[in-house]
A protein has these predicted regions:
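Conserved Lys-Pro-Asp/Glu-containing loop-to-beta segment of HAD-superfamily phosphomonoesterases
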Residues: 5, 103-131
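Substrate-recognition element of Asp-dependent hydrolases with the DxDx(T/V) motif
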Residues: 54, 59-87, 93
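Active-site donor-binding segments of glycosyltransferases and PAPS-dependent sulfotransferases
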Residues: 83-111
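Acidic, Mg2+-coordinating phosphoryl-transfer loop and its flanking beta/alpha structural elements
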Residues: 118-158
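Short catalytic/ligand-binding loop motif for oxyanion handling, primarily in non-cytosolic enzymes
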Residues: 15-17, 23, 74, 81-85, ...
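Active-site neighborhood of HAD-like aspartate-dependent phosphohydrolases
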Residues: 1-47, 148
């Protein structure tokens, strides 16, 4: 039997992505703030940011539980002007999720073009809502009232198998 395909967004879902500069790792905070002030860009475009980020609470454990029943791929977007973040995301996966195996990372600004069963994403952008509009596909809005944490997502996905 083929396992259902489960796409996981990285930023804010698997990776604890900072919403503000104050939440950025102390080792690069000052440099990032100065860069943002000079370039009037968002901190997500700052080169080197992604390499300092840690996993979201409960994410690694949840992925381990879900691997038994789902074909898991990471489906993330990356800042277009921060090419370094693309390779940093790949390195992050190798560091924190080696158990997923190779070639499990897809970078796209059109998540709705991918076919699968589930997409866990904290934002509605980049085709997340549209992904859920296709028959047999579901967008799970991570961090929402229905799915506030990994525990609720795992429970929902495991129940969907019944």
């Amino acid at each position: 039997m083929t396992k259902p395909i489960l796409y996981l967004d990285m930023d804010g879902v698997v990776v604890d992505f900072p919403e503000t500069i104050e939440e950025i790792d102390q080792s690069i905070r000052v440099e990032c703030r100065e860069w943002c002030e000079k370039n009037s860009k968002h901190h997500s475009d700052f080169e080197g940011l992604f390499a300092t980020l840690k996993p979201m609470k409960g994410a690694i454990e949840a992925i381990e539980k879900l691997r038994e029943d789902f074909e898991i791929l990471l489906l993330s977007s990356a800042p277009w002007n921060n090419i370094e973040s693309w390779s940093h995301k790949r390195r992050w996966v190798g560091k924190y999720l080696p158990q997923l195996g190779k070639k499990r990372l897809i970078l796209s600004h059109r998540k709705d073009l991918n076919r699968g069963d589930y997409l866990v994403d904290d934002r509605s952008r980049n085709g997340a809502i549209e992904f859920g509009n296709y028959e047999g596909q579901e967008w799970i809005n991570f961090g929402s009232d229905h799915y506030p944490n990994w525990e609720s997502v795992v429970a929902h996905l495991k129940n969907s198998l019944r």
